[in-house]
Amino acid sequence: MTVKLTIDCMGGDHGPSVTVPAAVKFVRAHPDAHLMLVGIESAIRAQLKKLKALDDPALTIVPATEVVAMDDPVEVALRKKKDSSMRVALNQVKEGAAQACISAGNTGALMAVSRYVLKTLPGIERPAIAFALPNPTGYTMMLDLGANVDCEPQHLLQFAEMGHALVAALEGKERPTIGLLNIGEEVIKGNETIKRAGELLRASTLNFRGNVEGNDIYKGTVDVIVCDGFVGNVALKTSEGLAQMLSDIIREEFGRSLMSKLMALLALPVLMRFKKRVDHRQYNGAALLGLKGLVIKSHGSADAYAFEWAIKRGYDAVKNGVLERLARAMADNSVSLGDGGHDAGGAGTASPAPGHHAEPSAAQSSKA
């Protein structure tokens, strides 16, 4: 089966100078992939010419006359730039010409245009960016990582439902554990939105294990961690910054003296494995869940190596039938939730996690 992906070549901080080389390298490594390169035709052709890939049959140019800038307001992307590379790329998915879209463009614009073009799955008000973050035994699915800065309690419940469905679909787990990211484990902690979301989650039939904290993200405490996009994006980029700092410190320390350089040579295999594990670029590319089509969001600052990983996220998602499996799991889950109810004031309650004491009134995509 040929995997057909559409690439928003103009998106991100670097545009075609990053997206086109990544696309060329990807198709050369994946003979069953066909990529549609969407954007300003002259800019794309110039990059393909440099790479001697103008005649590559696995690459097709789809012209677009406009570009959504990284600082464009949502309304500009949605209402004024109707022939943007982002919108044309998403239309390829809508029309069935492609099976997934990969973009490094403006996050707010991508979410809004995706919702408009592809529409959301039944019962979902807002898409959410979800990604599998590594832990010692596998991964923890975390959402939202930046699509929704402000959320209502019911949106966090919907994110939990999507996370549940995705892990159930990918891992075959009947009842993935869910945690709500908060400043403490206690039920009384957090702002009103978090408290109300906790009530909704406890009243649902989801396997909600209570609040989790930032230090639980990489421990594997739960299968799914739910948060709003503001908190999630800060947590993600803080993690990436920390990983980069650790790599820089190790490089600096091993380069301090002749002795340390000799030790670095002896430890080189271990250091290379460490570098590979903490290189945040290989974790680039997160799914925009809740849509009737596959959309992968890359970091806007991604280089060609990182963007190639984002393309691979889309490729793997298509090969694994993620969209179809997610839609089925969401449908099955909605029946289950319908039995339990969403009303936090109802009788349906979930058992608290071990060590978590409920108030009387309260009731893993592997690395590509």
Swiss-Prot record:
Entry function: Catalyzes the reversible formation of acyl-phosphate (acyl-PO(4)) from acyl-[acyl-carrier-protein] (acyl-ACP). This enzyme utilizes acyl-ACP as fatty acyl donor, but not acyl-CoA.
GO molecular function, one term: phosphate:acyl-[acyl carrier protein] acyltransferase activity
Region (Disordered): 338-368
Principal location listed in the UniProt entry: cytoplasm
Keyword match Transferase: yes
Catalysis performed (reactions): a fatty acyl-[ACP] + phosphate = an acyl phosphate + holo-[ACP]
UniProt GO BP: fatty acid biosynthetic process; phospholipid biosynthetic process
Record's subunit section: Homodimer. Probably interacts with PlsY.
Coiled coil: none
Family according to the record: Belongs to the PlsX family.
UniProt KW Transmembrane helix keyword: no
UniProt entry keywords in alphabetical sequence: Cytoplasm, Lipid biosynthesis, Lipid metabolism, Phospholipid biosynthesis, Phospholipid metabolism, Transferase
Locations listed in the record: Cytoplasm
Pfam family, one: FA_synthesis
Protein name per the record: Phosphate acyltransferase
GO cellular component term, pick one: cytoplasm
Record's signal peptide: none
Pathway participation: Lipid metabolism; phospholipid metabolism
Enzyme Commission designation: 2.3.1.274
Record NCBIfam families: plsX
Top-level division of the source organism's lineage: Bacteria
